[in-house]
UniProtKB/Swiss-Prot annotation:
<dbReference type="Pfam" id="PF13368">
    <property type="entry name" value="Toprim_C_rpt"/>
</dbReference>
<dbReference type="Pfam" id="PF01131">
    <property type="entry name" value="Topoisom_bac"/>
</dbReference>
<keyword id="KW-0799">Topoisomerase</keyword>
<feature type="domain" description="Toprim">
    <location>
        <begin position="1"/>
        <end position="111"/>
    </location>
</feature>
<feature type="site" description="Interaction with DNA">
    <location>
        <position position="499"/>
    </location>
</feature>
<dbReference type="Pfam" id="PF01751">
    <property type="entry name" value="Toprim"/>
</dbReference>
<feature type="site" description="Interaction with DNA">
    <location>
        <position position="146"/>
    </location>
</feature>
<feature type="domain" description="Topo IA-type catalytic">
    <location>
        <begin position="132"/>
        <end position="568"/>
    </location>
</feature>
<dbReference type="InterPro" id="IPR013497">
    <property type="entry name" value="Topo_IA_cen"/>
</dbReference>
<dbReference type="GO" id="GO:0006265">
    <property type="term" value="P:DNA topological change"/>
</dbReference>
<comment type="subunit">
    <text>Monomer.</text>
</comment>
<dbReference type="InterPro" id="IPR013826">
    <property type="entry name" value="Topo_IA_cen_sub3"/>
</dbReference>
<feature type="region of interest" description="Interaction with DNA">
    <location>
        <begin position="166"/>
        <end position="171"/>
    </location>
</feature>
<dbReference type="InterPro" id="IPR000380">
    <property type="entry name" value="Topo_IA"/>
</dbReference>
<feature type="site" description="Interaction with DNA">
    <location>
        <position position="158"/>
    </location>
</feature>
<dbReference type="InterPro" id="IPR003602">
    <property type="entry name" value="Topo_IA_DNA-bd_dom"/>
</dbReference>
<keyword id="KW-0460">Magnesium</keyword>
Length: 776
């Protein structure tokens, strides 16, 4: 009997049908050995000896493997074709050697395949190799590094930062990215700027829109027009001008398809198009790879899903091109196959890109046979694979340059149309921030043609801070920096959320206070080890180990020597030194720029400062013990809060920007929650204030939103039937419409700050209908 060992029962079931009766396929159910979660599992003083244990969960599977191996003439190790798969095979072989007293390595044959198809399996079995010790050592080095960081840094965190749960070699760097972005957002000061749009009409009475680009030969920049007065003055001048078409430019633009999916791009696109988390994407992809039941049989539908290679096999390309020619026509088929090269930092490119194993299994043919989410992901992979070998999209672009008759003002109008849809026929890549109009057409225009200015529209804008990371954009950033590996991204994001270091709100990552504390501590006392370049450099070293260019224990020794010295140094630091550093580093985040926000809300004379207690970090009054005010700054850690009003702590008290008169607008916190304030209090004259609606998070409040809130109640418009005003406002009961002395609540599904006149009239009509139904 020939024994074949794979990781999962699903994979075993699929492979078993391709091999004859002389083979027996069994599963290891993942890793059978690992480093136990205790001190001493990796021993630097003993040349980094690693003490592996068989887990209780894996015990029964190991017994079965050992028992079957005793009957076998040969053992085929058929785990996944990457470092982790190589490592699992090595552990299986080591356990069999130990338990069955096997001395010869010839008893084991390593078989690797990129897809679970009969052709790939039979070819792998016919061409076995030996275990690749370089790949095994690279995986052992990664595991040792992660252990050494986790099991030396985490206990130090527990002592120095009570309440913090863990630190990890890669997770801490990903957390720093999220926290650094939040710092940028908090310190960002929104600035006002304007641009001018002109609604124009050609000689055929066709309307189009242009944008003012030059005034008196000076090109307008973003901040050329910075306030309403300047915008209105310019608007009045433009209304007096007559424009004509000075020049028309026409050109073609070609758009090339994106490469086939790699792990990171699949996670990003599944997040954007399907709303899947990275974890969910990988779970479904794993099932599609290992084999799913499609009615008549169980087959592996996609190639291996942990890869950073963008190449496709020659056979796959030939099949794809054949299908394109048959289904879409020769005009969609390039003369030559497209060959892609990876742009990923540290790409290993050992495997093909992610593609269907059989391109003739179209999504439509499988729609009734796959679970809904399995179908969605397969459809995404299939379309991307087809598109990557299709012709370019061709865009016809038209640019109309307009000039005033006195040449003082220039404007520009752009139009585009898809001349040939190319790969758009089957697939378009999504973007995090899409702002693309492929079919914004201009009406027919001729050079020197005089055109009418129907309307001049000044547009007010505010600069916005960089957006928070989504799962897709964070994976992309990690990939760009060379941090982590395709197989690790999903687990990194999950761990950060499980540890309560970050929250995912509206599909964007927001750091929790606990996460910010950990990051500030690590940046202050372990800066080298959370630097992006250093972490990427370690990935390079692991690649060199895998390639046989670097001895793995040399790499571990180089890392450990400096890291252990850092640990010992921080262990000796006094807790007061750490608190003082944290206080200084978190000062802006906790209190903003307003010195008053540090005043104790209980005694009114003491100053709030950061303290560390057994339940975590908290703010306390400097007048202790006379004043015992305390407030936890970590959500869920309110054990140390016994006096004072917690809602009065000013954790978010910052300047959002200024209004058109230059008066500063603040976001503050008071006894009844957060509120917006216009200017400072002058004597007994209180500044204008307005509460922040309960459905708005403080982190979402921008200058633009604050200005809208301060302007409430606000006239939306005139009711077309009655001629009466419709007013939008906000009270302690929530947003409302005021119409003919009646107050009508605005449901949560509406964005009341941007409520349209039509929606307001619908709400008025619905309210009227309800009253008529109720009272007759």
């Amino acid at each position: 009997m020939k024994l074949v060992i794979v990781e999962s029962p699903a994979k075993a079931k699929t492979i078993n049908k391709y091999l004859g009766d002389e083979f027996k396929v069994i599963a290891s159910f993942g890793h059978i050995r690992d480093l136990p979660s205790k001190k001493g599992s990796v021993l630097p003083d003993k040349n980094f000896l690693m003490e592996y244990d068989i887990s209780d969960k894996a015990g029964k599977y190991v017994d079965a493997i050992v028992k079957e191996a005793r009957k076998a003439e040969v053992v085929y190790l058929a785990t996944d074709p990457d470092r982790e798969g190589e490592s699992i095979s090595w552990h299986v072989a080591e356990v069999i050697k130990e338990k069955n007293k096997v001395e010869s390595d010839d008893f084991f044959k390593r078989v690797a395949f990129n897809e679970i198809t009969k052709k790939a399996i039979m070819n792998a079995v016919a061409n076995p190799r030996k275990l690749d010790t370089n790949l095994v050592n690279a995986q052992q080095a990664r595991r040792a590094l992660d252990y050494l960081v986790g099991f030396t840094l985490s206990p130090l965190l527990w002592r120095k930062l009570p309440g913090c749960k863990s630190a990890g070699r890669v997770q801490s760097v990903a957390l720093r990215l999220i926290c650094d972005r939040e710092d940028e957002i908090e310190r960002f000061k929104s600035e006002e700027y304007w641009d001018i749009s002109l609604k124009m009409q050609n000689s055929n009475n066709d309307l189009f829109t242009a944008k003012l680009t030059h005034v008196n030969d000076q090109k307008l920049k973003k901040f050329s027009i910075i306030n309403e007065k300047e915008a209105k003055d310019l608007t009045q001048k433009l209304k007096l001008q007559k424009f004509y078409v000075e020049k028309i430019e026409k050109k073609q633009q070609k758009r090339q398809p994106q490469p086939p999916f790699i792990t990171s791009s699949l996670q990003q696109e599944a997040a954007r198009k399907l709303g899947f988390s990275a974890k969910k994407t990988m779970q479904i992809a794993q099932k599609l790879y290992e084999g799913v039941d499609i009615g008549k049989e169980t087959i592996g539908l996609i190639t291996y899903m942990r890869t950073d290679g963008v190449t496709l096999s020659n056979d796959a390309i030939a099949d794809i091109r054949k299908l394109i020619d048959k289904n879409y026509g020769n005009q969609y088929l390039p003369i030559k196959p497209r060959i892609y090269q990876s742009k990923v930092k540290n790409a290993q490119e050992a495997h093909e890109a992610i593609r269907p194993t059989n391109i003739t299994y179209t999504p439509d043919s499988l729609k009734q046979k796959l679970e809904k989410d399995y179908y969605k992901l397969y459809e995404l992979i299939w379309h991307r694979t087809i598109a990557c070998q299709m012709e370019n999209v061709i865009m016809d672009l038209v640019i109309a340059n307009l000039a005033s008759e006195n040449k003082e003002y220039l404007a520009k109008a752009n139009g585009s149309i898809i001349a040939f849809d190319g790969f758009y026929k089957v697939y378009r890549e999504s973007l995090d921030d899409e702002d693309e109009e492929d079919n914004k057409m201009l009406p027919p225009l001729k050079e020197q043609e005089h055109i009418k200015t129907k309307e001049v529209i000044p547009n007010k804008h505010f600069t916005e801070p960089p957006p928070r990371y989504s799962e897709a954009s964070l994976v992309k950033k990690l990939e760009e920096l060379g941090i982590g590996r395709p197989s690790t991204y999903a687990s990194i994001l999950s761990v950060l959320q499980d540890r309560k270091y970050v929250a995912l709100e509206k599909k964007r990552f927001i750091p929790e206070e606990l996460g910010r504390l950990v990051t500030v501590f690590l940046v202050g006392f372990f800066k080298k080890y959370v630097e992006y370049d250093f972490t990427a450099g370690l990935e390079n070293e692991l690649d060199e180990i895998a390639a046989g260019k670097l001895e793995w224990k040399t790499a571990l020794n180089n890392f450990w020597r400096g890291f252990n010295h850092n640990i010992e140094s921080v262990n000796e630091q006094k807790i007061t030194e750490i608190i003082n550093y944290l206080q200084k580093a978190l000062d802006y985040h906790l209190f903003g720029e307003d010195k008053e926000s540090k005043v104790c809300p209980s005694c009114k004379t003491g100053q709030l400062s950061l303290k560390l207690g057994k339940f975590g970090a908290f703010l306390a009054c400097s007048n202790y013990p006379e004043c015992t005010f305390k407030k936890s700054i970590v959500s869920g850690n309110d054990n140390n809060e016994d006096e004072g009003d917690p809602s009065t702590i000013l954790n978010d008290n910052k300047i959002l920007g200024t209004d058109q008169d230059g008066v500063e607008i603040y976001l503050k916190k008071g006894p009844y929650g957060p509120y917006i304030q216009l200017g400072e209090q002058c004597g007994k004259v209180k500044p204008k204030r307005t509460p922040v609606p309960a459905n708005l998070k403080q982190s979402e409040i921008t200058l633009e939103i604050a200005l809208k809130l301060l302007n409430l109640p606000l006239k939306i418009g005139i009711h077309k039937d009655s001629g009466e005003e419709i007013i939008i406002g906000y009270s302690k009961f929530g947003p409302y419409i005021k119409y003919m002395c009646k107050f009508i609540s605005v449901p949560k599904k509406y964005d009341f700050l941007n409520l349209s006149l039509n929606d307001a009239m619908k709400l008025i009509q619905n309210n009227k209908a309800k009253l008529e139904k109720k009272y007759g």
